[in-house]
Regions:
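Short amphipathic alpha-helical coiled-coil/interface segments
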Residues: 24-27, 75-83, 249-257
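Gly/serine-rich nucleotide phosphate-binding loop at the start of the catalytic core
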Residues: 1-74, 96
């Protein structure tokens, strides 16, 4: 399987940065040339101009000659792919399977813009990535060398993408590399249920009664700080009558997104490592249809709602589970927080078309505390995670019913 590593390109000299920026601009020019040829051919003939025909037209182009041939061909292939999607949708329209109003021809990139450089043939020299040049470009420009991340040493790199950000004020580099799937022989009779929340990002409970919480208050803090500073910047913008997003706002958003991405990656790794260390072969994750939740954090400056990207956490878990041979299941989680696990309440599925009221044996008596019909107290999120595990029907829960209690959950703070 393939994994992707993202980094910001740093430690370039001024000449190297200018060269990279120029290459990205040339790539944009070639992209627009390729788009122009296909569009004009379609307008005249109502047919599709194939990749091979477009290549024959452009191989002597000035922009094509300035780029390394592999890099130039990757650009033509990407343009070809976008138009194939367009013509595929046209076929669906003819068959009455798609709305004609939603289809648009691929547009040109901005004249002064930049686009992604795709490197399909990776050349390394002393653990440095050497950006491939054409013979023509090499005569007049100094080579660009980017240090390879230590984690990729010895790995087979399939593709590298260099993506201009904020009108090429900086570049992001994405390495796609191959890893072997380590299929561990884990016990499929052991399962871990996960209930997603806000203060407790992940509440994890096993069918043997062990439990732990991954703290989510740090994510709230990151979002809260972002909203506070962004509100100040927005106020300054409004006074100066600036309509577009400012560079300071973009930097602030990028920092916030990077911190959240890092936090979720570490949280997913903690969960999967726990399964590997405790011979747990199945993970069941509770989910909502939109996989987003809103929370009122009781503050001002447009901070009433915080969006946490649970979908990213889900995808990271799926990826890691596939890598190590842990079976992963998404489980619809309606009423799992209201039903009582130890009372064996039936857990219905919420129907938007026909919503109904249900009565359950237990109830939440305090924030974070659930009481069963016989007065036993249990962590409310643990009760939800257990019901997610029960609703999935993937593991036997008789041990828990016989015990009638859980271990006290341990809170894990991600650093």
């Amino acid at each position: 399987m393939y994994l992707t590593l993202k980094q910001q390109v740093k430690h370039l000299s001024k000449k190297e940065f200018r060269n990279l920026k120029y290459l990205s601009h040339i790539a944009k020019n070639l992209t627009n040339e390729a788009i122009y040829n296909i569009r004009q051919y379609y307008f005249k003939n109502k047919k599709y101009l194939s990749y091979n025909e477009n290549y024959k037209i452009l191989k002597n182009s000035e922009n094509y000659k300035k780029l390394n041939s592999n890099m130039a061909q990757q650009i033509l292939k990407e343009v070809d792919g976008s138009f194939k999607s367009f013509f595929g949708l046209l076929k669906l329209v003819k068959n009455g399977q798609y709305d004609n109003k939603k289809i648009k021809l691929p547009k040109y990139l901005a004249k002064d813009g930049f686009t992604t450089l795709v490197i399909g043939f990776v050349r390394l020299k002393d653990d440095m990535l050497i950006i491939p040049y054409s013979n023509l470009f090499r005569k007049t420009h100094k080579e660009i060398a980017i240090k390879l991340p230590p984690v990729l040493k010895g790995k087979k790199i399939k593709e590298i993408r260099i993506i201009p950000k904020q009108h090429s004020r900086y570049f992001e580099i994405q390495y796609t590399y191959e890893v072997k799937e380590v299929q561990r022989e884990l016990n499929k009779e052991n399962g871990l249920g996960i209930d997603l929340g806000i203060d407790n990002l992940c509440t994890c409970v096993t069918n043997n009664g062990a439990s732990f919480l991954i703290d989510g208050r740090k994510l709230k803090s990151i979002n809260r700080y972002y909203n506070k500073i962004n509100a100040k910047l927005q106020s300054i913008k409004d006074k100066q009558k600036i309509e577009n997003t400012t560079l300071r706002q973009k930097r602030l958003a990028r920092k916030r997104n990077n911190r959240i991405e890092d936090y979720l990656s570490k949280a997913a790794r903690i969960i999967v490592n726990y399964c590997l260390n405790n011979d747990i072969g199945r993970i069941v994750l509770g989910y909502n249809e939109d996989f987003q939740r809103n929370s009122n954090i009781g503050s001002i400056n447009n901070q009433n709602f915080v969006n946490i990207p649970y979908g990213k956490l889900r995808d990271k878990l799926i990826h890691l589970c596939k890598l190590y041979g842990v079976e992963f299941k998404l489980q619809e989680e309606s009423y799992t927080s209201k039903a009582s696990f130890f009372d064996g309440d039936e857990i219905p599925i919420y129907d938007k078309e026909n919503p109904q009221e249900y009565i359950f044996s237990g109830k939440r008596i305090k924030r974070g505390l659930y009481q069963t019909s016989v007065g036993k107290l249990i962590n409310a999120d643990c009760n939800g995670a257990l019901n997610i595990l029960r609703k999935s029907k993937v593991v036997d829960l008789s041990i828990l019913y016989n015990r009638g209690e859980l271990n006290t959950p341990k809170r894990i703070r991600v650093v």
